[in-house]
């Protein structure tokens, strides 16, 4: 939105520079993106009067003009503009003057004739050709009214001005108008805002005698009104109005069209003006378009309509596409005499869909899309009637023809001074707060401690108490909020919560094991939403996802970790070890919030040991991944157990569930070869744990023991067993018969292949013995070892 300071002064008067005003507006929530100064780079620009014009003796397209610029004698200026003529008031850049683009005006001779200055077009003084009236597109600008030669041309053109460009957020649609901005400025400077004149001298003839209005779709069009103006004269609008439109980025057309656009900018209320005699009937019917119905819009384009489009009709034929663009046969033309002015409220969603589908974005549609102020609908139409009467010689018929209900002009919200002060740390009295609301143009009522604020419809961004609190903070001034320290009744030393402490421990363990922490998106594709999910629950899908890859909330962290590993491997980083602690989401019943559960997941692929100085290269395998998980359990003083499992997406023979206190809390396994190949990964191992479940278990105390005074002893045992017997079953048997001197076991080799029967595998296990009270003897260890071997043989193992 472009806000002219010269125009703004018509509604509110302040004693401050435009730069200070722009800074103040920005600091209170509306960003002023740019400040356009029309006086910049311009010097010695005056009004001139062309006293005479003669053809240049040596150039067919040049004219020698004698121009009065308010000095003792006229100056001679050679001009090539086709529309220059004697008797015109024009813009003159004097010798020594300067124009935009660094152009300096000097005395010169053009084809032998002296030229002392330059008669200027609007383009030459910095106006974009996009906004210049068509009558001056290819020539100099000519004032339509008498001027005083020698006066400042920028002042005569209302261009002695600076324009603020607002970068508005969607919630501040009120600032899409001059009056809305004036309310804001008046509040900032605690001054009054003056509204423009809207009262016309009306004829005794009633508009109801010439027109009827019917709404067939009040769910989409809650209100539609029209007023009638007769005997308008189509001519250029006054210069001040044209220039204000130009500064706002709109090309002037004629007085009737310009008044429509002017009121749009003034009130933020889009209007449409129909040629009453071209409508074709005395009725206006608002309805939904019929399927396949066609109409030609003002841009001479035939549009095929959908039933979702709203149309204004003469009872049969569409004469306008509501809120977007008018129809061609009812538009205002040079011979138009009688005008019907439309003011309405249209459904924002319908207007947005229509304008986007037809690629017809306009000043009107953008305002309807954001919602308009009900308080300004009729007032804007009345303002247009007044301007047509004043600047188009129109005769305004009395009464308004309307259908539907405008709705409330205000929304009451109750609040207290205590609530405001407690929220933002102020110490304002009730009177101070009421004054701020009154500055904003909000009426108030006081009942004891309660302030009832009447929020006008133009401020659609204010719907709850917190919005009112923000308004108080804005107008009072964020910079004026006092700096205070919080007061505590009791001061305690800060510390981590139990969950924070345990989370930090887990991260340290995983980082110490060589894994890097990853943070991935919570959104995945619909296909990946249930991949690796430990619970089969309904997914949570976005209504309008930005892409198919981010359409649903995840139920596992692994899809994005696999994607991250694949991304790294594709970029020559083939040894990837990642973990993530993050939330997954499970849907509940309709209308209920989803369950949000924190998971711990990891992925390992490539070599675990990669540098020679670290030792022999070690490729990631199941047992290494399990060792990482076991480190987590040891750090948390928990005991995990493992059980063979089949999980979609994982290798059927190298996957296990992870149990804690006989409850499944996760899984570990090798990525299925097909899935790994699809992601250009070699053997890859993953794990996932319900982190919330880990955190819920009481860790208890870790009991430390002195370093043993007596040496321990190790024995290795190699077993040949059926390939479907898990190592965990063998270890369970070993510990059951190891007595109190068997301290721990370690599987250090697994072999299948040559020299073994089909369906068999060899497992090598190290048994570590220790007695803390005395030195172990071979006889004692051998006895326990024999008992263990006997139990294993009974289980079906063959001692190798």
Swiss-Prot record:
Tell me if Metal-binding is a UniProt keyword of this record. Answer: yes
Pfam families, per the entry: B3_4, B5, FDX-ACB, tRNA_bind, tRNA_synthFbeta
* Keyword match ATP-binding: yes
UniProt keywords (A-Z) are: Aminoacyl-tRNA synthetase, ATP-binding, Cytoplasm, Ligase, Magnesium, Metal-binding, Nucleotide-binding, Protein biosynthesis, RNA-binding, tRNA-binding
Species of the source: Staphylococcus aureus (strain MRSA252)
Under the subunit heading, UniProt states: Tetramer of two alpha and two beta subunits.
Q: What is this protein called?
A: Phenylalanine--tRNA ligase beta subunit
The catalysed reaction is:
tRNA(Phe) + L-phenylalanine + ATP = L-phenylalanyl-tRNA(Phe) + AMP + diphosphate + H(+)
Task: Tell me which EC number(s) this protein carries.
Answer: 6.1.1.20
Q: Where is the signal peptide?
A: none
Gene coding for it: pheT
Q: Which PANTHER family would you find in this protein's record? A: PHENYLALANINE--TRNA LIGASE BETA SUBUNIT (PTHR10947:SF0), PHENYLALANYL-TRNA SYNTHETASE BETA CHAIN AND LEUCINE-RICH REPEAT-CONTAINING PROTEIN 47 (PTHR10947)
Q: Where do the annotations place Mg(2+) binding?
A: 461, 467, 470-471
